[in-house]
Amino acid sequence: MIPVLPVSAQAGRLNEFIAQVNDYDCERIFTPIPDAEMVISITGDSMTPEYVNGCRVLVKRIDDRAFIDWGKTYVLDTASGVVIKNIFPTSDPATVRCVSVNPAYPAFEVQAKDIYAWYKVLMSMTMK
């Protein structure tokens, strides 16, 4: 079973939150994905229709120095908060490009030094 963090993407610093939350504060769920480490709820519509408001994503923290699967979806813990985006390289190795699935939202770049942690999205769950 893995913890469902009582925080959503686009809200505060994830690393600080994880350090402060107690295991007993978290709902726990069974996961069909053996490598999943935690569950995060998604808010907003920037990633619809792939990740809808209120869905939950199962994620695994990765070492961004080892390998980044460009073009895939990640939850990034950044200096500006937690975001879920499709991530692409830029011509500047010190920045990454964050792209929403919803074309109504413009892409933006984030300095690599402002990314505290990378979490690869392994699966999404939506309640019907």
Give the role of each language-model region:
Residues M1-N53, D63-A66, M125-K128:
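Short, positionally conserved secondary-structure boundary motifs
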Residues V59-K60, L76:
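A generic structural signal for residues embedded in beta-strands
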Residues D45-T48, I62-R65, A79-V82, D92-P93, ...:
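Short, charged/polar surface micro-motifs in flexible loops or helix N-caps
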